């Protein structure tokens, strides 16, 4: 499964377990297909902050899936 599709599905299952900012940024990146720069401007945070938030969300979603296994 393509990474973007997989993360999008994981967001549907586990998104509410992320922080509000992680969820917002991840949804904009994976579901709305916005760039890091566009998200940074919308969220009023640095581009690097957007990237870090996405990476933390990806890690958290992966951890939740490995423990709960609802998607697989």
Task: Enumerate the language-model features and the residues they cover.
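C-terminal flanking helix
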Residues: 58-65
């Amino acid at each position: 499964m393509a990474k973007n599709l997989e993360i999008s599905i994981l967001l549907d299952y586990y998104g509410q377990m992320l922080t509000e900012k992680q969820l917002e940024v991840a949804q904009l990146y994976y579901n709305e297909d916005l760039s890091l720069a566009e998200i940074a401007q919308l969220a009023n945070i640095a581009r690097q902050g957007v990237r870090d938030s996405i990476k933390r969300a990806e890690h958290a979603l992966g951890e939740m899936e490995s423990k709960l296994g609802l998607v697989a």
